Swiss-Prot record:
Keywords: Cytoplasm, RNA-binding. It comes from the Bacteria. HAMAP family: SmpB. One of its GO terms (molecular function) is RNA binding. It is found in: Cytoplasm. This is SsrA-binding protein. GO terms for cellular component: cytosol. Belongs to the SmpB family. It holds the Pfam family SmpB. Required for rescue of stalled ribosomes mediated by trans-translation. Binds to transfer-messenger RNA (tmRNA), required for stable association of tmRNA with ribosomes. tmRNA and SmpB together mimic tRNA shape, replacing the anticodon stem-loop with SmpB. tmRNA is encoded by the ssrA gene; the 2 termini fold to resemble tRNA(Ala) and it encodes a 'tag peptide', a short internal open reading frame. During trans-translation Ala-aminoacylated tmRNA acts like a tRNA, entering the A-site of stalled ribosomes, displacing the stalled mRNA. Its main location: cytoplasm. InterPro entries: SmpB, SsrA-bd_prot, SsrA-bd_prot_CS. It comes from Rickettsia felis (strain ATCC VR-1525 / URRWXCal2) (Rickettsia azadi). The keyword ATP-binding does not apply.
Length: 152
């Protein structure tokens, strides 16, 4: 059975630049104008990442556009946003990202079936240049395979 997800934003660049070793789902603390802007699909997580500050995890550099109909109560577009995780998950994440070379990257942002905004995070390790070339070759080979299958 598949879950309902209305995807708001995806970080395709992260899948190219990192090896994703583990995926997690986290809630996010938002203001009302941010939620309204997300409902219109005005968000970008291309350059966003998450980091720990003691016993909490925050999402940095996530751009949520200002909501036009909100007056003076509008939000800052790139403010750090707190991620909602269980304490056990936070400790596990902190342990993993303290290892050299690992980072916590936002992969996608979506509404779940209860209309709550969720962020899919990935514990990732950066790819080297030759790894990126290999992934491009694999992608091209899969595309060529599908073309050959369609021609037959």
């Amino acid at each position: 059975m598949t879950e309902y997800k209305k995807v708001i934003a995806q970080n395709k660049k992260a899948l190219f630049n990192y090896f994703i070793e583990e995926r997690l789902e986290a809630g996010i603390v938002l203001k009302g104008s941010e939620v309204q802007s997300l409902r219109q699909g005005k968000a970008s997580i291309e350059e966003s990442h998450a980091a720990d500050t003691g016993h909490e995890v925050f999402l940095y550099n996530c751009h949520i556009a200002e909501y036009e109909k909100a007056n003076r109560f509008n939000h800052s577009t790139r403010r750090p946003r707190k991620l909602l995780l269980h304490t056990k998950e936070i400790k596990k994440i902190i342990g993993r990202i303290r290892i050299k070379g690992y980072t916590l990257v936002a992969l996608s942002m979506y509404f779940n079936k209860k209309n709550k905004v969720k962020v899919e995070l990935g514990i990732a390790k950066g790819k080297k240049l030759h790894d990126k070339r290999e992934s491009i070759k694999e992608k091209d080979w899969k595309r060529d395979q599908s073309r050959l299958i369609r021609q037959k």
